[in-house]
């Protein structure tokens, strides 16, 4: 029986271009979404393309520990470490949500050495929109 010879230039096996394309990003936007259960930090460039992200869950915190301020601080530090290597110097911060990690994430970003243009709270507030769910009785 004839021996199978795999094609070396097949489209399946060859990656066109690199996956981790490092480009210089002088300015970016840091989005912090702090809920009661988790804190997600996403860093984008000015056009909105995601450069780096991290959350308390990806940093190894499980269960109720994800909502703690220390978990938010760790998540913010992990996200910023990757973009500071790419040369980010200036950033704008958008903070969303009522969680405990808001201030801790902001403190970690401040300590990183990135200059902040402004800090904006973009928490969605209804102007008497949909009816809220009933309160829990425990």
Swiss-Prot record:
Pfam families attached here? Ribosomal_S11 (PF00411)
Give the source's domain of life in one word.
Answer: Eukaryota
**Where would you find this protein in the cell?**
Plastid, Chloroplast
Main subcellular location of this protein, as a coarse class: plastid
Extract one GO cellular component term from the record. chloroplast
Q: Which PROSITE patterns match?
A: RIBOSOMAL_S11
Keywords assigned: Chloroplast, Plastid, Ribonucleoprotein, Ribosomal protein, RNA-binding, rRNA-binding
Tell me, which GO biological process terms does this entry list? translation
Q: Give one GO molecular function term.
A: structural constituent of ribosome
Question: Belongs to which family?
Answer: Belongs to the universal ribosomal protein uS11 family.
Subunit notes for this chain? Part of the 30S ribosomal subunit.
Q: What is this protein called?
A: Small ribosomal subunit protein uS11c
């Amino acid at each position: 029986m004839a021996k199978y010879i795999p094609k070396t230039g097949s489209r399946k096996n060859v990656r066109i271009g690199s996956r981790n394309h490092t480009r210089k990003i002088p300015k970016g936007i840091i989005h912090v979404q702090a809920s009661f259960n988790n804190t997600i930090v996403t860093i984008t460039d000015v056009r909105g393309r995601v450069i780096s992200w991290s959350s308390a869950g990806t940093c190894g915190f499980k269960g109720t520990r994800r909502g703690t301020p220390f978990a938010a601080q760790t998540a913010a530090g992990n996200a910023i470490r990757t973009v500071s290597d790419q040369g980010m110097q200036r950033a704008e911060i958008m903070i969303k949500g009522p969680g405990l990690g808001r201030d801790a994430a902001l403190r970690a970003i401040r300590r990183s050495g990135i200059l902040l243009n402004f800090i904006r709270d973009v928490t969605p507030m209804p102007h008497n929109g949909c009816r809220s769910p009933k309160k829990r009785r425990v």
